[in-house]
UniProtKB/Swiss-Prot annotation:
Originating organism: Aspergillus oryzae (strain ATCC 42149 / RIB 40)
Pfam family of the protein (one): Peptidase_S9
Signal peptide: 1-18
Major site of localization recorded for this protein: secreted
Homology family: Belongs to the peptidase S9C family.
Alphabetized GO MF terms: serine-type endopeptidase activity
Protease recorded as keyword: yes
Gene Ontology annotations of biological process type: proteolysis
GO cellular component: extracellular region
Record key words, sorted: Glycoprotein, Hydrolase, Protease, Secreted, Serine protease, Signal
Protein name per Swiss-Prot or TrEMBL: Dipeptidyl-peptidase 5
E.C. no: 3.4.14.-
Family annotation (InterPro entries): 6-blade_b-propeller_TolB-like (IPR011042), AB_hydrolase_fold (IPR029058), PD40 (IPR011659), Peptidase_S9_cat (IPR001375)
Subcellular compartments: Secreted
């Protein structure tokens, strides 16, 4: 067992309370902590769902950055966003999600945090805008950007003011037809700019809307920003001097369903000129051969430079993300930074005009690194955070950083760190605040490395409540999606390993071939190897666990996975490894090889299987879970979950698998949500999902009998449709 890196679990048993599905789903969910200009306090939002009232309540709080104390700012559920206004330590601009004058619109209000309820309305906006970024100019005026849906003519889309069409028909002459969970229309996301004029009056200055909003995206045909379904405020930035806006858009001049290519556009804040790409095919500074996705544009403090990341490959969504720094107005080739570093960045911010901070996935964590703005390609950035996954970071006046993160053991962790000293002080953490998470701590998690098919593979181990290594617990083998993704030391409300562990399992979550954060070689090796290298890594991982962990019962083990993990569960069902498990759970996995062409992002399958469906069909069929010889091996009880709004992997994939399992006489159940996509996010649906998944696993692993508090399939009140005689 020398490869296992024990934390404190070897010496002491955990005293954590069991985390159950209701507690997970109803525990408070908090946003990033956003500091004021002086770094004295920070604001953050909090929402909480109640299974008693079946409603969500929300509030905004103030965190004292010296004491860590938290106090309520407002529990007005209409307050959707708050940003600090200028250099004033107590004045904020907030978004009121309702509009007294325009149904479906929002309002901008200005208030002092010491007297929040007595603010005033500064602007009335004609649609549902969000993602506000603001700067105060030398004149004292406030310039801002935000986004909303847009009509082709550039006006903001307001759903409440649109007449319902007489026909529901949709007509398409190009792809996409649909994406993620929606059908494309002639509408698109767009970044708008606006100004609040400062007026000096009695007491404090006041602000009022000045002029109309400007659509900065619509003048570029086929451009869209933020880019759905996951784009947001990180897709654009406003220069500190208020003069420029940079935004990301997928390439507007090539088919978007076939390529990942994206450009960073630059446009005056007032929209006086049409946006132009700084890294497009005709841009003078575009690096040679760099044609892939791009994102996270951010201006330097002096507004003279833009940092962003970009991939080289135009068909590989998980290609290496390299950092670039563009000088505004320059026609020189845009230089890359630390391009030889075997890590791919997720986010970037400026520390000052000469240095940057980047967020990077690294060995199952997401850490912060510092890097000079003129670093060469051979530079190795320096890490200054440790475990967990960083979700946000803001520079404080003393050049330290206010960091918001999560971990497997906490949903919210706020601390101060610096490039020179590392983590300095923890201010607040959810497992000390929330009764639902009471007692959770880093001791519930370990990791180990083992020899995989061709290299060492990392795996997390998550222990159950009151773990005792002298006892034996069934294995729950956790397989992640992506496939170019990974299990991270992060909190999840959908696939939380601690919830599974506390039923009475030891969860083992490997990061096999294809996993991100362990170098490009491991990640890229999955291409055309979906059922090859990763499966072999998982087999070797199971063997390692079986041989080395006396407290893990592999005879009664179970396995579960989603998306690519769902594919792998389907593949395992027809493989020898499938006979090692008492039950399987497949969530939104591909099943029929020839159905892969029904997805929306065609570049994905074309990259993964080295070509198009018609030129390389054998590559698609090479790893086909529905191959006849594999179906004949199906025998392990299996729960299949697939929802109607999943357009990435259509619901027919799950139905096909369920049909075959039923006809083969394999114990099986199909769980469907007509209103969910690739994920299950509705709180009540999430509870049913957990009850069914955990109940299925508990039934066949024996946990249902050994743990009187374990979730049972009978916990679900939804009736089961069963027409068997």
């Amino acid at each position: 067992m020398g490869a296992l890196r024990w934390l404190s679990i070897a010496a002491t048993a955990s005293t954590a309370l069991a985390l159950n599905p209701e507690g997970l789903i109803s525990a408070p969910r908090r946003s990033e902590a956003i500091p004021n200009p002086s770094g004295d306090v920070a604001v953050f939002s909090q929402s909480q769902y109640s299974f008693k009232t079946h409603k969500t309540t929300s509030q905004w709080n103030v965190l004292d950055l010296k004491s860590g104390d938290i106090k309520l700012l407002t529990n007005d559920s209409d307050v959707s966003e708050i940003v600090w206004l200028g250099s004033d330590d107590s004045t904020v601009l907030y978004v009121n999600g309702t509009n007294a004058d325009i149904p479906g619109g929002v309002e901008l209000w200005v208030s002092d945090i010491s007297d929040f309820a007595n603010g005033y309305k500064a602007a009335s906006l004609p649609a549902s805008f969000s993602g506000f970024k603001v700067v105060t100019t030398d004149s004292g005026d406030v310039r801002y950007v935000a986004y909303a849906e847009s009509w082709a003519n550039g006006t903001a889309y307001n759903e409440e003011l649109v007449a319902k069409p007489l026909s529901s028909a949709r007509i398409y002459d190009s792809i996409y037809v649909r994406h993620w969970d929606y059908y494309l229309t002639t509408r698109f996301n767009a970044v708008f700019s606006g100004t609040l004029k400062k007026s000096e009056g009695k007491g404090k200055a006041t602000y009022k809307a000045d002029g109309d909003l400007k659509n900065l995206v619509s003048p570029v045909k086929n451009a869209e920003s933020p880019y759905p379904p996951f784009g947001g405020a990180s897709d654009y930035d406003l220069s500190p001097d208020g003069k420029w806006v940079a935004f990301k858009s997928k390439a507007h001049d090539i088919p978007r369903a076939n390529y990942t290519t994206a450009y960073i556009f630059l446009v005056p804040h007032d929209g006086s000129k049409t946006a132009v790409p700084i890294n497009g095919p005709d841009s003078p500074g575009t690096p040679e051969g760099v044609k892939g996705d791009a994102g996270s544009p951010v201006f330097s403090p002096d507004s003279k430079k833009i940092a962003y990341w970009q991939m080289a490959d135009e068909s590989y969504e998980a290609d290496h993300r390299t950092l670039y720094v563009y000088t505004v107005g320059s026609e020189e080739t845009i230089p890359s930074l630390a391009a030889d570093w075997d890590r791919s960045l997720d986010s970037v911010k400026w520390a000052d005009d000469d240095n940057l901070i980047i967020g990077v996935e690294d060995a199952g964590r997401s850490r912060l690194f510092s890097i000079p703005a003129d670093a060469g390609d051979d530079y190795k950035p320096k890490n200054f955070t440790d475990g967990g996954v960083v979700s946000a970071y803001y520079q404080l006046p003393d050049s330290t950083y206010l960091v918001t993160s999560t971990a497997i053991w906490t949903s919210w962790n706020v601390y101060i760190a610096s490039p020179e000293k590392g983590v300095i002080k923890t201010l607040a953490t959810a497992n000390k605040i929330d009764p639902e998470l009471k007692g959770l701590g880093p001791e519930i998690v370990d990791e180990f490395y083992y020899e995989g098919n061709w290299t060492k593979i990392q795996a997390f181990v998550i222990y159950p409540e009151n773990f005792d290594k002298s006892k034996s617990y069934p294995l729950l083998y956790y397989i992640h999606g992506g496939p170019q993704s990974s299990w991270l030391d992060s909190w999840s409300t959908r696939w939380n390993p601690k919830v599974f562990a506390d039923q009475g399992y030891v969860v083992v979550a490997p990061n096999p071939t294809g996993s991100s954060g362990f170098g490009d070689a491991l990640q890229d090796a999955i291409q055309n190897q979906w059922g090859g290298y990763p499966y072999e890594d998982l087999v070797k991982g199971w063997e390692y666990v079986n041989e080395n962990f006396d407290f893990i019962d592999t005879d009664n083990g179970v396995a579960a996975g989603a998306s690519y993990g769902g594919f792998m569960i389907n593949w395992i069902q027809g493989s020898d490894l499938g006979r090692k498990f008492k039950a399987l759970v497949s969530h939104d996995g591909t099943f029929v090889a020839d159905a892969k062409v029904s997805t929306e992002e065609l570049w994905f399958m074309q990259h993964e299987f080295n070509g198009t469906f018609w030129d390389n069909r054998e590559n698609y069929r090479r790893w086909d879970p529905s191959a006849p010889e594999r179906i004949l091996k199906f025998s392990t009880p299996m729960l299949i979950i697939h929802s109607d709004l999943d357009y990435r992997l259509p619901v027919s994939e799950g139905l096909s698998l369920f049909n075959i399992l039923q006809e083969r006489g394999v114990p099986s159940r199909f769980l469907n949500f007509p209103d969910e996509n690739h994920w299950v996010q509705n709180k009540e649906n999430s509870l049913v999902w957990h009850q069914q998944v955990l109940g299925w696993l508990n039934k066949y692993s024996g946990v249902e009998e050994s743990n009187e508090d374990a979730v049972s399939l009978d916990n679900t009140v939804i009736p089961v449709v069963d027409y068997n005689p």
